Amino acid sequence: MKLTIIRLEKFSDQDRIDLQKIWPEYSPSSLQVDDNHRIYAARFNERLLAAVRVTLSGTEGALDSLRVREVTRRRGVGQYLLEEVLRNNPGVSCWWMADAGVEDRGVMTAFMQALGFTAQQGGWEKC
């Protein structure tokens, strides 16, 4: 089975279970999506392994809550997820990712810089 990146527009029961494992701090009812508030996820064997929330506003995009399930980390899933999010939103010329809730800022800085982001006060930017 191939790892695929998807935009979640409707949540299946299994999606809800997997999202609770990825983001235990969010209630399912708080994960609302529309054209400007999106959730992208990495799926493998019908299970979500990682997810990120995306907020779009004109040519600007904000990423938050990027999380890869612990057992899947360090395998390129997060990188593939973000690369596909950026590729699927070509109208966005400037991206921002806040560092709120980041477990290890040093690790995340290296990760974000590998994707072309630069460290800023409070997060990372790619314009």
From Swiss-Prot:
Keywords: Pantothenate biosynthesis. It comes from the Bacteria. GO terms for biological process: pantothenate biosynthetic process; protein processing; zymogen activation. Pfam families: PanZ. Coiled coil: none annotated. Residues 43-48, 66-76 are annotated as: Interaction with PanD. The keyword Transmembrane does not apply. SUPFAM superfamilies: Acyl-CoA N-acyltransferases (Nat) (SSF55729). Activation of PanD processing occurs even at low CoA concentrations. In contrast, full inhibition of PanD catalytic activity only occurs at sufficiently high CoA concentrations. Controls both the activation and catalytic activity of PanD in a coenzyme A (CoA)-dependent fashion. Binding of CoA or a derivative to PanZ leads to interaction with PanD, which promotes the processing and activation of pro-PanD, and subsequent substrate-mediated inhibition of the active form of PanD. Inhibition of PanD activity is probably the primary metabolic role of PanZ, allowing negative feedback regulation of pantothenate biosynthesis by CoA. This is PanD regulatory factor. It comes from Escherichia coli (strain K12). The lineage of its organism: Bacteria, Pseudomonadati, Pseudomonadota, Gammaproteobacteria, Enterobacterales.
